[in-house]
């Protein structure tokens, strides 16, 4: 995402608990965003915030883990509910970072997370909207931004076909140390669309402010 915006002349920076995969450490803050915020004054005057809060406990696919033995009739799983509450507070904290325009990534959430977060305007997009043959619903909670428009919409294959299985690679990712990272990775086509469409708005804002 950072690379796509920088290619369009926007001074984009990233922050993650992991190092930058592209080696551009000069534009990447390695660590907790809330560690850097008090020490980095320019972060309090952002034109655009694109946030990627941890969403594991909020995803609808994991709702069953909120209950003991993954069965609602067994009653709530206190540990998992505590994780959910912590995840919700983290999401809210990321969303509260001051910025003129915001796009906060989120999964297809279960109703408990939706209620606790108080979700605002939201759009869901798919990689195949932007020319990449994969299924992965990505939600964006948007503030002062339009939804992304498809740039190269493909035709999804029929369920049960080999091609459909290939498109479902994200959901079929096998267990392993890299599973979470691979499943959360942003697709290039969507990043390019965000940089082109939202980046144009940021550049227009800058031109208007300079006029």
Could you describe each region identified by the protein language model?
Residues 1-211:
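Conserved active-site and SAM-binding loop architecture
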